Amino acid sequence: MAEKHGNLSINSDNLFPIINKWLYSDHDIFYRELISNGCDAITKLKKLDMMGEYELPADYKPQIQVIVNPDEKTLKFIDNGLGMTADEVEEYINQIAFSGATDFIEKYKDKANDDQIIGHFGLGFYSAFMVADQVTIDTLSYKKNATPVHWACDGGTEFDMTDGTKEGVGTEITLYLNEDCLEFANEYRAREVIEKYCSFMPTPIFLSKANAETEYETIDAADKLDTDTVVEEIHEEAKTEEKENENGEKEVVEVSPAKEKLKIVKRPVPLNDTNPLWAKNPKDCTDEEYKEFYRKVFLDYKEPLFWIHLNMDYPFNLKGILYFPKINTEYDSIEGTIKLYNNQVFIADNIKEVIPEFLMLLKGVIDCPDLPLNVSRSALQNDGFVKKISEYITKKVADKLIGMCKTEKESYEKYWDDISPFIKFGCLKDTKFCDKMNDYILFKNLDDKYLTLPELLVKEEEKKDDAEVLDKDGNPIANTGDAAASDNTADGSDTSADSEKDERKVIYYVTDKVQQGQYIKLFKEQNMQAVILDHNIDTSFITQLEQRNEKYKFMRIDADVTESLKDETSAEDLKAETDALTEVFKKALNNDKLTVKVEKLKNENISSIITLSEEGRRMQDMMKMYAMNGMGGMDMNMFAADQTLTLNANNELVKYIFEHKDSENVPMFCEQLYDLAVLSNHPLSVDEMTKFVERSNKIMMLLAK
């Protein structure tokens, strides 16, 4: 071939600065592009062999070599794929590659950074000019009697193409790195980038350093391969020891036989796994393989709870593995990572257009060869095909969870505390997921038993008829069913006058078993139940459940004093106590807005209870959540929940205050009763606690006199 000097049909003053601007944050991506090109060339050559258009050598081993040379500031990418002729270099490098790069830049040069190309695919070979002042290609086509070609370009508008000297079929690309990118000639940096993008590419990738000292290893002679370079044969003598036999006589015993070993040049080890676990049939994978893959990919040495192996060929090709990690705190789940691959080539983490947002809480890999990559994120958002992928993934996750609940209930319950934030978040974010999961969400009750929502409602309905109710002395009394018949709660208890307006079943819940211990004790004495909802997400979750289903509502255990906790007494019977005690407590506490109720509770040991309206508390909780997420700025007191102080007319101390309301110590007793009630509901402030301790000391001094 005659030497050719030509001009590229593009203004490089426009192209390369834009490439650098576009890909600056991911300027290591050229590794992936060049190695991917090598993989494609090898795949095509193997297909030609399968079709009978080319015969591969018997000892052919597909591979890609990456050679770093820090001394010469170069980086080589060598593949033994199908190579190129001069005409193909002209077509694929001088015309198509540059043309494709030009179209790419022209289409997306005005896009904002948050609308970038998915994975930056499309630039291919010319991504090399992000880091190199000059790039050369040496290639030899598989075609019979092909002539090797040498091509060179310094990133300007000109290139040189001549006959080359390459002897083996394939392509060698050499990058002469610019001064700002010499890090990529470092062996450890190269390894890091290759493992980032190419850990699972389908062709073995080998990394080496030019002019490095030869490394050796020793193997058993029986393990020698034809490709091994033997440096030395080693004979190890048998090892013997002197031992006493059964007769007490000493004799020489062989403890290790003689061995023949070989010192060989260290065998190269590929950096990648060419057959990743997700590409295998799930039936052929063991639990240990799944766990090992998880540790390797996510560097997490805590075992995952369980996993879902996705394997679909129609109507689109998608494979992957999603892991449910073990969560140590309620915040751990936000650290999930879903890695997206295209034909085993890493694209990016957490592509929200493809992967449902709530799945980002998991860890996993998804490989979808059919995914369109040379489009912007905004295009993906509106792509019906991508939406189907997202819906399929969501469906498979729901199917797995439902299947576990039905057939592996014990395991499902064991995992529930870890996976419940994920499932609840998914229900909040995805209506279809919520519809499927609605009857398989578990609630843990005060006895640490897990029940689905339908089971919970049925169980509590049954308790209305069977409950053993206790009187104020703790003795069982007959349950005629009349009280239950008047109840509208899932626990067999009327909530308040509101129950006349709202016929929903009430599900009581607890957010802190320690803080709300007094209320729990009252419930258990009357054989009532509540569920535990102690995660930040639960307020939003139960609100959504109520909006979707009018059959039930949730109420925190301290939101009201239910009828089942009271003796049967009319409000008229307690009018005198209510009027007097309301006046005394409002005056003692200097709080005219305080709502005071007087009830006869069955447990006479409890003097007072603070209740907060459910609606007000939920608003408070939501405002706290906004503040935690940096969305504060509003006065939290604006959303203070309405408090009600309920005094127990059966309690001796309350009786004393009523009978001695003019006593000089009564205001102090009122303050103490109020603080005791508050303590059972939420912690006191520093100032409130200081006053509480001082007051307690005064009361003890009175008792000591």
Feature locations, PLM:
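GHKL/Bergerat-fold ATPase module in large chromosome/replication-associated machines
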Residues: 117, 135-158, 178-181, 188-705
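GHKL (Bergerat-fold) ATPase N-terminal catalytic module, capturing the glycine-rich phosphate-binding loop
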Residues: 1-185, 192, 199, 215-217, ...
